[in-house]
Curated annotation (Swiss-Prot):
Induction: Expressed in the late phase of the viral replicative cycle. Interacts with the terminase large subunit; the active complex is probably heterooligomeric. Keywords: Late protein. The terminase small subunit binds to the packaging initiation site and regulates the ATPase activity of the terminase large subunit. The terminase lies at a unique vertex of the procapsid and is composed of two subunits, a small terminase subunit involved in viral DNA recognition (packaging sequence), and a large terminase subunit possessing endonucleolytic and ATPase activities. Both terminase subunits heterooligomerize and are docked on the portal protein to form the packaging machine. This is Probable terminase, small subunit.
Amino acid sequence: MANDVLVPDLMSPEGMDVIEAYLQCGSDVPSAARSLGMSEIAFRDIMNRSEVKNYLNDIFMESGFRNRDRLFGVLDEVIKRKLEELEETGMGSDQDIMDILWKAHKMKMEEMKMMVELEKVKAAARTPANQTNIQNNIIAGAGDQNYMDLITSLATGGKK
């Protein structure tokens, strides 16, 4: 579910209200805060929560031509038209097609590089920045005579 854009990760109701108002008011924070009857500071506090930010970023990146499927679909259409134009008119060169393909390849490689970087950042966020290991060499119950008698009894098979 974490990768599903339509299902936010554990979003509070007020977070969803803030997102809805923000989008309905055209990304205008003051008017969105007014529409919810909130102070702008409280509105921004909710907007700065990581789950709200991530959800808004996902919505933004999946809309319009920022959506990678739509962007590359348009790019495929440009290549297709250019090939048809080259076939029909004989005008143009293979270099035109190669330039477009090179740009498409470069865009795809940059996208993949950014995805790898994002995964590295996510992995780093999951691991602790500082870890302190403590070794406790104090034997539990060493000061308790009943405990020590039990351990001795177990070690000797019940014989004293």
